[in-house]
């Protein structure tokens, strides 16, 4: 009865929420709160502990974020954590904020100032597990009893869904959503959190480790846009979670991007022909090249040209782009925690990638590209091109090559100019559109 009444309350509540249709027009800058910006210049950074980044630091760098054209940020989980758990995924109290990141007033001011600057705020949340406290459940609030958790087992086989949903990730106690009180409490918690702080959207950690039926209820309780982490390269497996949440991160495309820009575009051609059609709504998927769970692109593939092509591709492809902080400054950290390096004193607004990201975001907004489908126009091992509405986007994983695109809808004599580089124009001939690629991608529009 309690759960039924709460769901009815949610349905009757009038909350100002940003829909998935609105979110697909946004471009997201992902921030690890402890590593993006701090307000004190003292102290070194031990990557396994807090380094001093906070909400006030983000506030001070809003112009830096806006300068790249981003109109949404995704920040780390905000709740109280075990000491040294700078990342935010070791929750100890679901009703207290993490004071390492600042006060509640600081957090509210961050959201208020973001909204004044037309920047939406996405908060990372977790409904799967708590801090790794063994069986000392009294250390967790409000889930302070063994009955709130599945029996202790570790995940050894990620292809075994029973283990994925019921066992522990890295020894973190796994919440038991089959317990009505646990589910009711989580639903009320996320609803109240969003209402209290006027949060615009949520990123859901480890979505694949919770039964799908729970996400149907969680989605309704949240009342704002949700995008879930389903860390898997199988398109069918990932796509099924989009039937229970507004969106998921496009991990199959993530692997394809890395393979394509560091290897052969044959992978991307195959993705476009087959994998993308498996998703119920690809226009809402999170598109990314890097994040806090994976080594940075430049660690795997130490080539700034290839990285630049990949980032601009992610901003123009179908879906909601998410750029990981520091990519614009060519951070190249390896495995966790070195992929979460501090950005201190490295806010160069003249870096080539910073400026190209700004131009790509300008193109997104100016041409409303989210209203248009992708049409693949050319694909071989080293060159890839697609049209999306009025734009022709061209990418390379090898510098100094020339290709002629014959599959297009432009007219002979049309003059196309590259919005990423002034003065770079081509004319459509009877033979097609001949593109000469250098280090960087090209985005042409008809003049």
Report the location of each language-model feature.
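Positively charged n-region of N-terminal signal peptides that target proteins for export
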Residues: 1-4
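Hydrophobic h-region of N-terminal signal peptides that target proteins for export
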Residues: 9-16
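Substrate-binding/active-site clefts of carbohydrate-active enzymes
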Residues: 19-27, 32-197, 212-228, 235-237, ...
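Structural recognition of the beta-strand scaffold that forms the well-ordered cores
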Residues: 27-32, 72-77, 93-95, 120-124, ...
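Generic structural signal for secondary-structure transition and capping sites
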Residues: 36, 119, 294, 319, ...
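Generic structural "secondary-structure junction" signal
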Residues: 38, 91, 96-99, 171, ...
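Active-site-proximal helices and loops of the catalytic beta/alpha 8
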Residues: 111, 115, 188-288, 302-305, ...
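Active-site neighborhood of divalent metal-dependent phosphoester/pyrophosphate hydrolases
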Residues: 127, 289-296
């Amino acid at each position: 009865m309690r759960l039924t009444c709460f769901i009815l309350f949610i349905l009757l509540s009038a909350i100002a929420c940003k829909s998935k249709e609105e979110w697909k027009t946004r471009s997201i800058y992902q921030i690890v709160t402890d590593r993006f910006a701090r307000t004190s210049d003292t102290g070194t950074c031990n990557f396994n502990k807090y380094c001093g980044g906070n909400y006030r630091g983000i506030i001070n760098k809003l112009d830096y974020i806006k300068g790249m054209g981003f109109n949404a940020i995704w920040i780390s989980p905000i709740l109280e954590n075990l000491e040294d758990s700078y990342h935010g995924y070791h929750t100890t109290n679901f009703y207290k904020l993490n004071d390492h990141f600042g006060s509640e007033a600081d957090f509210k001011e961050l959201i208020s100032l973001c909204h004044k600057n037309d920047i939406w705020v996405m908060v990372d949340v977790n409904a799967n597990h708590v801090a790794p406290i063994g069986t000392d459940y009294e250390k967790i609030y409000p889930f302070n009893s063994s009955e709130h958790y599945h029996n202790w087992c570790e995940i050894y086989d990620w292809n075994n869904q029973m283990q994925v949903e019921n066992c522990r990730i890295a020894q973190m106690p796994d919440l038991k959503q089959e317990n009505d009180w646990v589910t009711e409490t989580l639903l009320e918690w996320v609803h109240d959190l969003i209402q209290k702080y006027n949060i615009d959207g949520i990123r859901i950690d480890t979505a694949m480790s919770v039964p799908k039926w729970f996400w149907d209820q969680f989605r309704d309780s949240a009342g704002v846009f949700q995008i879930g982490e389903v860390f898997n390269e199988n398109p069918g497996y990932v796509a099924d979670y989009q039937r229970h949440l507004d969106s998921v991160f496009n991990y199959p495309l993530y692997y394809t991007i890395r393979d394509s820009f560091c290897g052969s575009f044959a992978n991307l051609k195959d993705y476009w022909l087959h994998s993308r059609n498996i998703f119920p709504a690809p226009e809402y998927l999170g598109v990314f090249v890097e994040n806090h769970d994976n080594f940075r692109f430049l660690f795997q593939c130490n080539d700034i040209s290839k990285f630049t092509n990949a980032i601009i591709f992610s901003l123009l492809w179908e879906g909601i782009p998410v750029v990981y902080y520091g990519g614009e400054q060519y951070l190249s950290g390896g495995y966790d925690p070195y992929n979460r390096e501090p950005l201190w004193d490295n806010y160069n607004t003249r870096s080539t990638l910073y400026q190209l990201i700004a131009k790509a975001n300008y193109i997104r907004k100016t041409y409303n590209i989210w209203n248009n489908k992708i049409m693949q126009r050319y694909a071989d091992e080293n060159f890839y091109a697609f049209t999306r509405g009025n734009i022709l986007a061209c990418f390379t994983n090898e510098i100094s090559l020339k290709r002629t695109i014959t599959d297009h809808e432009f007219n002979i004599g049309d003059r196309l100019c590259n919005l990423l580089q002034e003065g770079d124009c081509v004319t459509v001939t009877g033979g097609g559109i001949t593109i000469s690629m250098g280090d960087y991608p090209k985005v042409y529009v008809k003049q």
